[in-house]
UniProtKB/Swiss-Prot annotation:
CoA binds at residues 224, 227, 251. This is 3-ketoacyl-CoA thiolase, mitochondrial. The active site is at 92 (acyl-thioester intermediate), 382 (proton donor/acceptor). The modification N6-acetyllysine is found at residues 25, 137, 143, 171, 191, 209, 234, 241, 269-270, 305, 312, 340, 375. Keywords: Acetylation, Acyltransferase, Fatty acid metabolism, Hydrolase, Lipid metabolism, Mitochondrion, Phosphoprotein, Transferase, Transit peptide. One of its GO terms (molecular function) is RNA binding. It is found in: Mitochondrion. PANTHER family: 3-KETOACYL-COA THIOLASE, MITOCHONDRIAL (PTHR18919:SF145), ACETYL-COA C-ACYLTRANSFERASE (PTHR18919). PROSITE patterns: THIOLASE_1, THIOLASE_2, THIOLASE_3. The modification Phosphotyrosine is found at residue 127. The modification Phosphothreonine is found at residues 119, 136. One of its GO terms (biological process) is cellular response to hypoxia. The gene is ACAA2.
């Protein structure tokens, strides 16, 4: 076994994902985490007093209270003030990383029950002004910086994230047509799963205000199930002439959060929790920043090797859909079985709120694996700057 102790998922919930500037735009990342965490505590019948640690992933730190995020989430959901909290940032892998950190705390017996999660409000990413605190003269031309837009460029290699995906398209000979067809598949799979109610077990509905008054939001807002291939083919490439990445085949800018509660085997017995899945293992790897999207390849390979398993053992595989060519490069490199990979659509359809996606993917795999009667699943994400992260779970159903 890859972990030193048995670690189990006892609850896994996520909010619906809101479109950029959509129904969730007025909720901070802290608010969104609170919704997910409350739902997870309730679903797992976990008393806040039993939680030993709170670990939340968040990337953009977009709200004024963001530096307190994990701490505020813990206090808001009733976890005792004596219980410590930690906010972490491994970019797009932050939701997964919260679970990794939680496993580590449990394995070294620093904690028995950990509230993990990831969250992002990309709609609330502020405009900011740099280098004006000192020496700014009267009448200076103040330049506003879009913190969301600039964050999507890796300054170390001077490449926007989309261009790292274009690099993979060239390297793996991936065509624009293949990218659009994959994007359409993501939308169609999301629609089929949503219509069938496959997201119900993971979803934590939110009450939102609209022009028509208050309503309950329980469906991902970003998805465009009516999309056609013809519409996708008409969209212009965003970053490169004759490129492959368009607004239609890239992950959606979104708002949302997820929460995953993990517990040691001892805690499961002591508190009579119902284990939904076991955390089998995890792996984090670095890769070339100019093709950061290939990160899931070494991450999945490393996690499988540590666990003594193979891709053939996996009943479900999730690779976060940052960009269609990025996903397709991973699919080709690992020779993934498309019948069990991203089976209910992914971030191209429902959006990618940076810190929230790892928690969303984990929650989905936990419930989908049980629904299908499968045994093993692996979830993964590429990470800006050139990294990959993967977590393997085993159903306990």
């Amino acid at each position: 076994m890859a972990l030193l102790r048995g670690v189990f998922v006892v609850a896994a919930k996520r909010t619906p994902f809101g479109a950029y500037g959509g129904l969730l735009k007025d909720f901070t990342a802290t608010d969104l985490s609170e919704f997910a965490a409350k739902a997870a505590l309730s679903a797992g019948k976990v008393s806040p007093e039993t939680v030993d640690s709170v670990i939340m992933g968040n990337v953009l730190q977009s709200s004024s209270d963001a530096i307190y995020l994990a701490r505020h989430v813990g206090l808001r959901v009733g976890i005792p003030k004596e219980t410590p909290a930690l906010t972490i940032n491994r970019l797009c892998g932050s939701g997964f990383q919260s679970i990794v950190n939680g496993c580590q705390e449990i394995c070294v017996k620093e904690a028995e029950v950990v509230l993990c999660g990831g969250t992002e409000s990309m709609s609330q990413a502020p405009y900011c002004v740099r280098n004006v605190r000192f020496g700014t003269k009267l009448g200076s031309d103040i330049k506003l910086e879009d913190s969301l837009w600039v964050s999507l460029t890796d300054q170390h290699v001077q490449l926007p994230m989309a261009m790292t995906a274009e690099n993979l398209a060239v390297k793996h000979k991936i065509s624009r047509e293949e990218c659009d067809k994959y994007a359409l598949q993501s939308q169609q799979r999301w629609k089929a799963a949503n219509d069938a109610g496959y997201f119900n077990d993971e979803m934590a509905p939110i009450e939102v205000k609209t022009k028509k008054g208050k309503q309950t939001m329980q469906v991902d807002e970003h998805a465009r199930p009516q999309t056609t291939l013809e519409q996708l083919q008409k969209l212009p490439p965003v970053f490169k002439k004759d490129g492959t990445v368009t607004a239609g085949n890239a992950s959606g800018v979104a708002d949302g959060a997820g929460a995953v509660i993990i517990a040691s085997e001892d805690a499961v017995k002591k508190h009579n929790f119902t284990p939904l899945a076991r955390i089998v293992g995890y792996f984090v790897s670095g890769c070339d920043p100019s093709i950061m999207g290939i990160g899931p390849v070494p991450a999945i390979s490393g996690a499988l090797k540590k666990a003594g398993l193979s891709l053939k053992d996996m009943d479900l595989v999730e690779v976060n859909e940052a960009f269609a060519p990025q996903y397709l490069a991973v699919e080709r490199s690992l020779d993934l079985d498309i019948s069990k990979t991203n089976v209910n659509g992914g971030a191209i359809a429902l959006g990618h709120p940076l810190g929230g996606s790892g928690s969303r993917i984990t929650a989905h795999l936990v419930h989908e694996l049980r629904r299908r009667g499968g045994k093993y699943a692996v979830g993964s994400a590429c990470i800006g700057g050139g990294q990959g992260i993967a977590v393997i779970i085993q159903s306990t159903a």
